[in-house]
């Protein structure tokens, strides 16, 4: 269902705003959690869509909305906010929410983008990388609280600082 507004997807394409996708995302984030409501997250978000709003911006609004609903009486919203943040991270990193790449494929991709140093191949054999991949259980990502996942994202994920605009206030020479 669209209201005539278009959204800009993370890959740069433009498509009509689909409110059902927002609802489905909230439903999935609330799945299996007691005392939470996808509709409440949507209502709390008060999304004021405008033509050309990015899907990343919509996701951030939903994350803040769920985060704002965390209270002593409604603690499970911390998991709703965490899941919404996790969906955002996965979409940004891999372009999808499910069917995540193997550790080997992730390393190859990061080396090709010059995020990782190629020296990683001299430190770990392919066998070791594949063995490590066998220990990764992505379903455990859903055990993070919002505060925990936010800290991992903000402090420990590799950030592309070239995308951050840093400006220093103009200083006037003292005479």
Give, region by region, the residue ranges found by the protein language model.
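Often metal-dependent polyanion-binding catalytic scaffolds in large enzymes
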Residues: 1-19, 23-162
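Single conserved hydrophobic/aromatic residue that forms the stacking wall/gate
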Residues: 164-175
């Amino acid at each position: 269902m669209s209201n005539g507004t278009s959204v800009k997807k993370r890959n740069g394409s433009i498509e009509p705003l689909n409110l059902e996708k927002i609802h489905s995302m909230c439903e999935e984030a609330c799945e299996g959690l007691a005392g939470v409501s996808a509709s409440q997250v949507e209502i709390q978000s008060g999304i004021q869509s405008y033509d050309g709003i990015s899907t990343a911006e919509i996701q951030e609004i939903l994350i803040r909305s769920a985060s704002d609903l965390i209270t002593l009486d409604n603690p499970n919203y911390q998991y709703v906010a965490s899941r919404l943040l996790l969906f955002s991270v996965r979409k940004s990193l891999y372009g999808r929410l499910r069917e995540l790449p193997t550790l080997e494929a992730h390393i190859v991709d990061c080396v090709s983008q010059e995020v990782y140093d190629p020296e990683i191949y001299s430190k770990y054999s392919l066998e070791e990388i594949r063995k490590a991949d066998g220990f990764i259980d992505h379903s455990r990502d859903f055990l993070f609280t919002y505060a925990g996942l936010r800290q991992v994202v903000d402090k420990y994920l590799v950030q592309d600082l070239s995308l951050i605009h840093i400006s220093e206030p103009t200083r006037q020479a003292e005479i």
